[in-house]
Amino acid sequence: MILKNKLTKKTLDIPYSEFRKKFAKEIQDAFESYRKTQLNKYSWNFKDDNSLEFNFYFELHWNFNHFGMSNWYIDRM
């Protein structure tokens, strides 16, 4: 994975497992924001609640960048 810092433009090239460890708090914050957004949608009542986490990680690139409040963003996976 290649991550970039929005402020300093620093680049990190790390494997997914290291990303999960190093950015655990940012991932959790992004997931909570994603979860709140999805649960507030009217159509969510028709979906399976167990799929929330699966859907978040399935589109991790987009969700981390748009729901996370981190100075880092995923440039490439």
What feature does the model see in each segment?
Residues 7-9, 51:
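Glycine-centered tight beta-turn/hairpin loop motif at sheet-sheet or coil-to-beta transitions
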